[in-house]
Regions:
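Serine/threonine-enriched low-complexity regions used as flexible
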Residues: 63, 135, 141-168
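Low-complexity, intrinsically disordered segments enriched in Ser/Thr together with acidic residues
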Residues: 120-141
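Low-complexity, acidic Ser/Thr/Pro/Gly-rich terminal tails and inter-domain linkers that flank the onset
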Residues: 28-58, 173-194
Length: 194
């Protein structure tokens, strides 16, 4: 009996030590450890999204950003906060409801963040375009807010025109009537009429 109690204590001590080692290995370096600190000058040279849309109609949202500074932007990113809206129904497990469905997002820009896309470093004088193809699924008037960042973790700050955060918004009216479309027999292209 005494021997099995001793084995039990050793097993418990060994298990505790292994658990401590395992938890200690989870830490690692901070997520933003490799992101440089600083301010990076950029300019939004294009931002467009149709003001009048129809439900079930695919449209493009475009934001193009130029590095107007003299140093490389570490990881050019754009956050779009308004592809979904909060439902007022109190008993929903997830109150987020789509306003637009993202059909395609900027190529190679997916991140771990739900509403942020990053296209990597941007050298001085260069421009990068973020293009989303989205389809409206909720009629009404909606505001789409966006902002540009120089990195994903907050240490690299994008600025435009001095100390301004490069950001903007679109006000969009989505009609509850789907747009009419047909196939042009001569070209095979889809022709939409509103």
């Amino acid at each position: 009996m005494e021997g099995s109690a001793l084995i039990g204590r050793r097993t418990l001590t060994l298990g505790t030590a292994l658990a401590a080692l395992t938890l200690g290995a989870c830490g690692g370096t901070a997520q933003d450890a490799k992101e440089p600190s600083g301010t990076f000058e950029v300019s939004v040279v294009e931002s467009k999204f149709p003001q009048k849309q129809h439900i079930s109609q695919a449209e493009q949202l475009v934001i193009a950003v130029k590095n107007t500074g003299n140093k490389t932007v570490p990881d050019l990113a754009v956050t779009v906060d308004s592809f979904a809206a909060k439902s007022e129904q109190p008993e929903l497990a997830d109150p987020s409801r789509a306003v637009w469905v993202v059909d395609t997002s900027p190529a190679g820009g997916d991140t771990a963040y739900v509403n942020t896309w990053a296209l990597g470093p941007l050298k001085a004088g260069k421009t990068r375009r973020f293009v989303w193809k989205v389809t409206a699924v909720k009629p009404g008037t909606h505001t789409v807010k966006w902002r540009v960042a120089a990195g994903l973790n907050g240490k690299a700050q994008a600025r435009s025109g001095g100390d301004q955060v490069p950001q903007g918004q679109f006000t969009v009216d989505v009609s509850d009537k789907p747009s009419q479309s047909r196939v042009d027999p001569a070209t095979g292209e889809i022709v939409r009429s509103n």
